[in-house]
Design a protein with these regions (language model features):
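N-terminal carbohydrate-binding/catalytic regions of secreted carbohydrate-active enzymes
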Residues: 193-271, 411, 418, 423, ...
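Hydrophobic faces of well-ordered beta-strands that scaffold small-molecule active sites
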Residues: 193-195, 219-223, 246-249, 279-283, ...
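An active-site-proximal structural segment forming one wall of the substrate-binding cleft
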Residues: 258-280, 301-315, 319, 335, ...
Length: 578
């Protein structure tokens, strides 16, 4: 052997010994380093986690280090039901048939190239587990909503095994009441199935063809009518001939000043009344945005709304007044509300688009159509039945020049499959069957929402509306009892369910007032209790904004006032007299 080869052999052997030494000795040294290196961990990254659709407020903040997220072991156990066992310097975390075993702070048989992922951290005496380790147990962890908000989502293996449209539905609070009066033509059980086809040239704008293709007679169709135009009697008769009743989207597009108690308004109302069938009148909708000619004038809007309501009440008692907003912005919605006595139904228009405002950087494929409904539903369904005045889903967009058929199938399936069960106060839904690439005004030719052009999308719609819960004709003689529901605006903390104080006030009919410190006083049937308030910021349904849920401990309140309740299949059911 040459001298040079001998030297290389010795050096190589030395390196091997050093590496072997690291394997045997280094973990203890790294363990010591981890204990002393907590200043490198950023704690307080987020105070919230979403797990399988439910919000959880953590007992301890989430940490972040080297692009990994760390969750405390007590919190991990609370929200995922993992089990732990400790013996000497060994810690085992298990879930179902998978387990992690830590020896002196490191997972056994872990690659040395991933030291930061293999070890856990200790902060203030608590063990913090990195997300990569939790994912070894089968969970999926990520920033909620494309990393643009500070909420972490944890999805269980069972949840991941479901189809996308069936994932993360979360829990629902149901409130069952007796002796609830119904609004005009309100179905107590079921949803009127509706659509808009007047711009679908693919089916020659035919309601009968739409009914045939979808395999279901639709109970209602709608038409846009500009204020100043006569009532569309001929079209309304076509709707009736197709087995439905009309919704008229009546829009004062020259501004609110033209709305007066004059001959035009009276004749419009008389023509509507002469039809002698239910008519859903969606007057001046989407006023909460900035894109209508009647936005930004809430006082005048309410004044004109009341005027139209009073004329309709006198001349056309068959007319249902639909006060209809757009999903967002939320902050301006309530200032336009005319009052319960002037509104029959509250509506909202919902669109699942792949990108917002034709901006490639504003990707919005994560948005859940059910969550887009939640704000209006939770705010108003305790006092008015709800209408989804328009619902559309992108299947092609010019923003990226791509077809998104799977996206459309997923969102349509999620909306129509779960709406009757989870949102019993929704009484109408209308699909917006339009290819806006052809039919929209210039500047808005962005998305194709039509469902008749592609078989997979049409089949998804047809499969989910075929149930008896979607109604094809007017229901009469509504039942006296009604089921209300409440979703999304609650969270779990320390094993307790906290619902927003507005739920306690509006849905349980309890008096809620700010009390001393961080507590609220709840009064019901002459009895009052003080309860601690816990707040949690959660993601809004769109645009990466936050909202604060001011939660009250629901179990404590129900027990204190002896309100009948039970947990069924993970949902809370409450029985309460109206």
């Amino acid at each position: 052997m040459s001298k040079r080869k001998l030297v290389l052999s010795v050096v190589t052997a030395f390196i091997i010994v050093c590496l072997f030494g690291i394997v045997i000795i280094e973990p203890a040294e790294i363990w010591s380093r981890i204990k002393q290196n907590n200043e490198g961990m950023k704690v307080g990254y987020s105070d919230s986690v979403v797990y399988d659709g439910n919000h959880y407020k953590l007992l301890h903040p989430i940490g972040e280090k080297n692009e990994s997220r760390y969750i405390s072991l007590p919190d991990l156990k609370a929200i995922t039901s993992v089990e732990t066992a400790e013996k000497d310097e060994e810690l085992t975390i298990s879930y179902k048939n998978k387990k992690l075993t830590y020896d002196n702070g490191f997972i056994q048989n872990c690659s040395l190239t991933k030291d930061d992922m293999c070890g856990y951290e200790i902060i203030d005496g608590l063990i913090y587990i990195p997300d990569q380790s939790v994912e070894r147990l089968g969970f999926q962890i990520g920033f909620f909503y494309d990393k643009q908000t500070n909420t972490v989502s944890i999805k269980s293996p069972e949840e991941q095994a479901k189809k996308p449209q069936d994932q993360e539905l979360g829990s629902t609070i149901y409130v069952h009441k007796e002796n609830v009066p119904a609004e005009k033509y309100e179905p107590r059980s079921g949803i009127y199935l509706g659509g808009y086809v007047l711009q679908d040239e693919y089916i020659d704008t035919s309601m009968n063809t739409f009914n045939k293709l979808t395999g279901k007679t639709h109970a209602s169709y709608f038409k846009y009518v500009g204020y100043g135009k006569p009532f569309p009697k001929e079209w309304a008769e076509e709707v009736i001939a197709a087995g439905g009743f009309p919704q008229v989207a009546w829009e004062p597009n020259n501004g609110l000043n033209e709305v007066k108690d004059d001959e035009y308004l009276r004749q419009f109302a008389k023509d509507a009344g002469e039809l002698n069938v239910p008519i859903l009148l969606r007057y001046a909708s989407e006023m909460n945005g900035t894109w209508t000619f009647y936005s930004g004038h809430s006082e005048q809007y309410i004044e004109k709304w009341k005027l139209v309501h009073d004329v309709m009440e006198k001349e056309a008692p068959n007319v249902m007044m639909l006060w209809n907003v757009f999903t967002m912005p939320e902050s301006t919605i309530d200032e336009f509300y005319p009052g319960d006595e002037y509104v029959d139904y509250v509506g909202v228009n919902i669109y699942n688009v792949f990108y917002h405002n034709d901006k490639i950087e504003a990707k919005s494929d994560f948005e859940d159509p059910l969550r887009l409904l939640d704000y209006v539903y939770n705010t108003y369904s305790h006092k008015k039945p709800i209408v989804i005045g328009e619902f559309g889903v992108t299947n092609y967009t010019v923003t990226d020049g791509q077809h998104h058929d799977d996206f459309a199938v997923e969102k349509i399936t999620r909306m129509y499959k779960y709406l009757p069960e989870l949102y019993p106060r929704v009484k109408f839904i209308y699909y917006f069957d339009v290819n806006n690439l052809v039919n929209a005004p210039e500047g808005r030719k962005i998305n194709n929402y039509a469902i008749t052009e592609k078989k997979s999308i049409l089949n998804a719609y047809a499969a989910n509306v075929k149930t008896d819960q979607y109604l094809s004709k007017v229901e009469g003689d509504p039942a006296k009892s009604e089921t209300y529901s409440y979703r999304d605006f609650f969270f779990y903390y320390g094993g307790e369910l906290y619902a927003d104080y507005k739920f306690v006030r509006d849905y349980l009919n309890m008096d809620v007032k700010e009390s001393r410190g961080n507590s609220m006083k709840v009064t019901f049937n002459g009895k009052g209790i003080d309860v601690k308030q816990e707040s949690l910021k959660i993601d809004k349904a769109a645009f990466f904004e936050k909202r604060e849920v001011k939660g009250l401990p629901l179990g404590e309140i129900l027990d204190a006032f002896e309100v009948e309740n039970e947990i069924k299949d993970g949902d809370l059911h409450i029985q309460i007299a109206k």
